[in-house]
């Protein structure tokens, strides 16, 4: 029943000068996996890692070549067997570690501010720009709804005020007109009932005409005020979006993918929207072209500048090692994964000169075939003694009921860091 369970351990292997490789170690029957087997596994992995990162593409890119990502490669050692493959670090195996300031109270939970990034076809897409487009569309819809609602509310309020003002003005106008009419009638026309009726009719006609003109003028003023309010709202929204973007870019705690367009942040929103729409259309066209031309090579991708782990850059590839039950009579030469000193090319990068793990080809090769032209050296004698002592130590060791990785991890800490 112990073979059913698995133990997953996440480690970081330091390679080159300033890089770290995420390792996902999946153990079957982990109770019998001891420290010696772990060290033996490390010596094999160093050659595989060196060969994989020989061209340097895996350090700064998430693109996996078909030969390295097609199937898992089985390798069998003296006691255990395992399969190995590489996978993109992001997004499935996300190792976006942030630089966090040291806290006074370590027991408090750590709050990490992060800027989301989206990888589409191995290309980085900034989620802030995409979210701005959606937010702008939503804001426009909300504005229209608010303007319609505000329009109804404002009309209701203004109608009451207008009625009161008009009533007051009509009363004052009536008084003025009555005073004028009385003065003119006293001088020219004698007072009589027919003249009073005519004057009353004239007064009513004048007040209605004035009301219609006033209503038209007020409606024009309302439209102007609404247009000014909409412009003010657009300006405020633009400022809020710009402030939000600058705060995220200026935050020292956040590690994000640096773009070359940092100087163009203060452009108008219309230009940004047009550019984003064009980019989205181009991305859709590129996706369609990639789907139609699956056999063709992909276009150039942006360099992978992922997270940091204790000041070291996390590589774009994650190594996945899964132990398997050893098959009787099945062997795979380890030398095909190991890069010998003779195979070194002059085009190799300088970063690999400072490879931390020891280059021990004699320890890795366990085949009995030896070339007759090769002479024995001190290295071969030391390896023979080391292998004999290792066999003696293995014969003395017995499987334990508990895993020794949790207790005896002194050798593990030399190569891996959790």
From Swiss-Prot:
Amino acid composition bias (Basic and acidic residues), ranges on this chain: 136-154, 209-227
Region: Disordered, residue numbers: 123-174, 209-231, 258-302, 344-418
Amino acid composition bias (Polar residues), ranges on this chain: 359-374
Taxonomic superkingdom: Eukaryota
Disulfide bridge partners, by residue number: none
Biased composition (Low complexity): 266-293, 375-390
Bias (Basic residues) ranges: 391-401
Amino acid composition bias (Acidic residues), ranges on this chain: 156-170, 344-356
Record protein name field: Putative uncharacterized protein DDB_G0288959
Species assigned in the record: Dictyostelium discoideum
